[in-house]
């Protein structure tokens, strides 16, 4: 027999048994839990309830939208409205085409509103383009300059240029005792200038120079008497139809000779300097134009005989250059026929020691450049005088070993690349264990498919 089972039923409590129960969690704060505590919790006292009720309320303020920091760099005009309107205006402007020049307005860049306005352009200040320093220099030069318009009125164009150049050269020299006013007065009178020119033509060059001496004192060099008279006593044989060329050469230095004028001074001022001109016996050398001249080490002095002839050689210091004049009767050698030693003879540099000292000295950089160009030498050691141990890597020579690189032209290649110390020669095949390249084979035909 089967037992009878009772079904569980839920019945509603009676009115006397009904009560309200509030459920809460232990983590909830006392504010969420109401004052009506459930049964069994009436004895608990919350001390923090009074403290919470007395906390003052803070009024909420809305923070600003942007807080700019002084350290930040903000681009100006990034959100400008005018930029958009300007671009829109430019895009709406149409390009104008004028069929003829007469149709083009006078000033199309100006608007009508600007053309209608009346403005005096004379009120606009002129901005100078020159610097302030240039204006001061120009004012200083104009205050110290001498105005002499009458100085060149009665003279020719060449004489006026020479006179102005001589005046400017004499006034610029420091410690010059030449009176510029007196010089201007003399040059302004054409009669005095003509008399001076005629007097210079009638007298020898020596007396003319002695009459125009200036009181300019300069330090003199020590006397060095060097006169080249013997040059190539046994000249080389001349070819068939080559005529000999005669060149009188004479270089003399004495303590009584004054220094030559500066190169930037004209010839008129050079004539006013104290130049003592003498006529040594010219030595004529016969040599063909196509052959060189051999200078001997021994020099013998030739006697000097002053005369008033046309052939005059200026005696000057050995270390200075000779300035040729049109009155000197010296045979000129054409440019195509000048030899290597011709400039040395004309300049008076006949000493072989001077030629040796003029050669550049080969320093350490010269040999390093040779090593860098030709290679195959060990790199130079680091110099100890480098500042704070720094080494110039450009001067270090990379040595390449004369042995082929075993990784070059392999499938993976050489990792070092151009900086590899071994040779990278693509013409040679450095390995034999590489399989021949695979060529595509023809497809097999399938039968019976």
UniProtKB/Swiss-Prot annotation:
Ranges in a coiled coil: none
Zinc finger (C3H1-type): 400-427
PROSITE patterns: ZF_C3H1
Gene Ontology molecular function: any one: zinc ion binding
This protein's record includes keyword Zinc-finger: yes
Region (Disordered): 335-357
Acyltransferase in keyword set: no
Sorted UniProt keywords: DNA-binding, Metal-binding, Zinc, Zinc-finger
Domain of life: Eukaryota
UniProt xrefs under InterPro entries: Znf_CCCH
Protein name (database record): Zinc finger CCCH domain-containing protein 68
Taxonomic source organism: Arabidopsis thaliana
């Amino acid at each position: 027999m089967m037992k009878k089972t009772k079904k569980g039923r839920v019945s509603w409590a009676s009115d006397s048994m009904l009560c309200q129960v509030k459920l809460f969690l232990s983590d909830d704060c006392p504010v969420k839990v109401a004052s009506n505590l459930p049964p069994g919790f009436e004895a608990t006292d919350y001390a923090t309830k009074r403290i919470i009720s007395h906390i003052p309320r803070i009024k909420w303020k809305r923070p600003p939208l942007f807080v700019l920091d002084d350290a930040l760099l903000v681009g100006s005009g990034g959100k400008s409205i005018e930029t958009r309107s300007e671009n829109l205006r430019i895009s709406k402007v149409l390009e104008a085409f004028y069929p003829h020049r007469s149709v083009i307005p006078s000033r199309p860049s100006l608007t009508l509103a600007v053309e209608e306005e009346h403005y005096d352009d004379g009120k606009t200040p002129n901005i100078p383009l020159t610097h302030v320093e240039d204006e001061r220099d120009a004012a200083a030069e104009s205050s110290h300059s001498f105005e002499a318009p009458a100085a060149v009125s009665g003279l020719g164009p060449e004489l006026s240029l020479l006179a102005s150049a001589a005046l400017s050269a004499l006034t610029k020299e420091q410690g010059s005792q030449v009176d510029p006013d007196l010089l201007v007065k003399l040059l302004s009178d054409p009669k005095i200038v003509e008399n001076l020119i005629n007097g210079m033509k009638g007298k020898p060059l020596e007396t003319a120079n002695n009459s125009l001496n200036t009181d300019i004192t300069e330090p003199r060099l020590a006397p060095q008497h060097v006169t080249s008279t013997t040059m190539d006593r046994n000249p080389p044989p001349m070819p068939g139809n080559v005529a000999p060329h005669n060149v009188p050469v004479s270089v003399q230095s004495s303590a009584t000779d004054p220094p030559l004028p500066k190169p930037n001074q004209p010839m008129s001022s050079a004539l006013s300097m104290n130049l003592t001109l003498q006529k040594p016996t010219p030595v004529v050398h016969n040599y063909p134009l196509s052959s060189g001249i051999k200078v001997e080490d021994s020099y013998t002095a030739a006697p000097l005989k002053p005369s008033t002839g046309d052939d005059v050689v200026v005696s000057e210091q050995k270390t200075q250059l000779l300035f040729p004049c049109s009155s000197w009767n010296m045979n000129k050698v054409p440019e195509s026929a000048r030899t290597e030693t011709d400039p040395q003879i004309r300049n008076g540099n006949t000493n072989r020691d001077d030629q040796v000292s003029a050669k550049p000295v080969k320093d350490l950089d010269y040999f390093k450049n040779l090593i860098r160009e030709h290679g195959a030498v060990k790199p130079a050691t680091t110099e100890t005088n480098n500042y704070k141990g720094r080494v110039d890597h450009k001067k270090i020579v990379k040595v390449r070993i004369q042995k082929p690189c075993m990784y070059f032209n392999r499938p993976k290649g050489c990792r070092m690349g151009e900086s590899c110390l071994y040779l990278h020669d693509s013409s040679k095949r450095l390995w034999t264990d590489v399989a021949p390249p695979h060529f595509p084979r023809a497809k097999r035909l399938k039968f019976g498919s």
